Structure formats: C-alpha cells, structure tokens
Amino acid sequence: MSEVLATYLLTDTTDSEKRAEQIAAGLTVGSWTDLPLVKQEQLRKHKGRVVKVEEKEGTSENETQSVITIAYPEVNFSRDIPAVLTTVFGKLSLDGKIKLTDLEFSEGFKRSLPGPKFGIYGIRKLLGEFERPLLMSIFKGVIGRDLADIKEQLRQQALGGVDLIKDDEIFFENELAPFETRIIEGKQVLKETREETGHKTLYAVNLTGRTAELRDKARRAAELGADALLLNVFAYGLDVMQSLAEDKEIPLPIMAHPAVSGAFTSSPVYGLSHALLLGKLNRYCGADFSLFPSPYGSVALPKESALAIHDECVKDDVFHPSFAVPSAGIHPGMVPLLMRDFGIDHIINAGGGIHGHPKGGEGGGKAFRAIIDAVLEAQPIEEKAASCKDLQLALDKWGRVEAV
C-alpha cells in the first residue's frame, strides 16, 4: 500500500507514543479502539500508522522533545500537495508545539509532480557555463523609477559579468515600467551587452497579479521571449507554481522567492522546517531556483537549516536538482565561505554587494567574478585583489569573512 510518511518534532509532550497514536488515528479514521472489529477491518487500509518515536534532548533544561514519523495511506487523499498538507498538518498545526520537518512520498506520488523543468544542468546549458557557481544580481531601488533608469541598471549589472539578474520581489506591475515592456526592453539591453562583452545574462521578470491571471501572463512572457520568471510562491501557494511548471506553453525556468515563508518556518517548535518548505517542496513543485537567507548575511538562517535546504535541492531523486540560492547581505568577501559551504552548484546572489560597490553595478559584478575565479584557482585573495582594482575596492569597503 502506498503511503506518505510525515515526520514531526514534538515539544513538551508528556507521552510521545500515545500522542503519536492519537495523531495517526485522528488524522485518518478518527477513533480506533472504540470501533467494533468489523469496522476496524473495513477501515484498516485507511488508518495511519506510527512508524517510529524517538526521544531527543530539548533545547533547554526543562524542555522535552521527540521525533515521530507517521505513515498516511495515499488512498485517503488525492495526489496533490494541498491535500497532503491538509491531511498531515491541517488542524494538527493548530494543536500545540508540533513542527512538520519532513515528508517522504511514494514513487507513484512523485510521478504526479513536475519537478524543475530545467534544473541545474538545464540552466547551465542555457548560459554555457558549467565550471563555477553562477552569479546573480538583483534590481534595487527601482520603485518609482522609470524605464530608462531600470534599463541602465540592467546594463551595468550585465557589463559586470553577472549570469542572472532578477526583479526585486516587491517590483509589481506599474505604469512606469510595465511587465511586458520590461521583458522587451530588457532583452534588447542584454543583447547589446552580450555583443559588447561576449557574456550571456538571463533576466528573471517578476510574475505578479491575481492568481487567475498568472497563467496567461506567464504564457505571454514566454511569447515575448522572457528568460525566466520570478514568483513569490508562498504568497500564491505551491500549487500555483506547480501549475505554471506543468504548463507546456510556459517553457521558462521558475525562480521561487521565499517571501512570506518566514511565517511558516521561523519558529523552532511550530510550522514547517526550512528544508521541507524551501528545499524539497519547492523542488518537487517545479522551482528551478530556490532562494533563501544565507547563514551569514543580513537576514541569516541557522547554518544547519541553510545547508539542509541546499541538500534537498541537490540530493539524488527522480527530479532534476534545483539551484540553491543563499541570499541577503552577500558581498564579495563572503565568496570563499559560500563556495566552501555550498560548493560549485549554487548561485551567489547579491543586491547591495553589487550596487553598493564604489564603481557601481559593473564594478560590483567584476569584483564578484574576480574572487570566484581566485577561489577556483586556489589563488590567494590578496594576490587577486592586487591585480583587480574592483575586487580591492570591494574588500576595502566590506572586508572579508574568513572561511574557518
């Protein structure tokens, strides 16, 4: 019988085994021990079962914690993520200190999900770059700016050698720089910079609006030649992203932004784990890129959580691996640490670390590219900076975070 396995962290539960049995029955058949034997036989295939209960040390002296895993028969729900989440963590999410930390799906269930359309290799193939972490920059301070300002910002970032440029997640449809115009004009700017430098850059445009409009808007973006889509997935829902990823008329990579996810993941004892929501479920539902706070930036995640997201993005599975994109407060001096912790197959994503460079976006991009090359070539950073003024200026401004 096919099942979905849900793993939870319980906090301050006096009898974990009893609690696990209550959850297994309560979220499937309801009461069990009070049922007559005939009814029990009829409902047995629908009943959840406790797979394991493990006690663990709490985070404080007076706190008790346990990890439980419960198997839910797939016969109880349709093969979609909303049905699963409602079953395993619907009303349960309102019932005390309990956190959903993982979900394991059957191979049959996985076949009903799209996974990333491009994945790491597909994105690298689009760019023709296979040997280093990719570099992404973000539009900053664009609200209230006209199209000319935005085009110049795009141009400067591309001249700096970044591989991807994304809209800010709070850059919505507006009359100064409409969605379709940004795509058309942005493509022309990037065409010109590629002719000038030989370097290809992709632009991810923010897909926004009412949910019912998104599919048609994304299809229109594809018709206009958009490179990729940015989606505030947790404002809309994972199922919305899945629908976009499954649509054959939207042959575009999807970049999943973590906005709003903190409401679900930030508590150590409530909600969902970062790895499950930003890693596994993002990947399964079609994200080619999953953005999340890095462990050492301005909005930092615990390092263990950030690395767990990355692991879920790239571990062997039936789906293409997704690019992990640790973000927030990234500057060139952090690159050795990023590459040590996240390896080659991740994206270095910077906003202020590029735009705040003394020589602007172009200088910021060049500084990042220089230090990436230095790490790959095992060249001392000081030696690289001596031959690259842009890198030296960046290190003078932000310093260097040592990889210890």
Curated annotation (Swiss-Prot):
Binding, substrate: K140, K166, D167, D168, E169, H257, G329, G351, G352
Cofactor: Mg(2+)
Keyword field contains S-adenosyl-L-methionine: no
Keyword Signal: no
Name of a matching Pfam family: RuBisCO_large
Cofactor note: Binds 1 Mg(2+) ion per subunit.
EC number: 5.3.2.5
Single GO BP term: L-methionine salvage from methylthioadenosine
Known pathway: Amino-acid biosynthesis; L-methionine biosynthesis via salvage pathway; L-methionine from S-methyl-5-thio-alpha-D-ribose 1-phosphate: step 3/6
PANTHER family reported in the protein's UniProt record: RIBULOSE BISPHOSPHATE CARBOXYLASE, RIBULOSE BISPHOSPHATE CARBOXYLASE LARGE CHAIN
Assembly description: Homodimer.
Summary of the function given for this chain in its UniProt record: Catalyzes the enolization of 2,3-diketo-5-methylthiopentyl-1-phosphate (DK-MTP-1-P) into 2-hydroxy-3-keto-5-methylthiopentenyl-1-phosphate (HK-MTPenyl-1-P).
Note: Has no RuBP-carboxylation activity.
Homology family: Belongs to the RuBisCO large chain family. Type IV subfamily.
Protein name: 2,3-diketo-5-methylthiopentyl-1-phosphate enolase
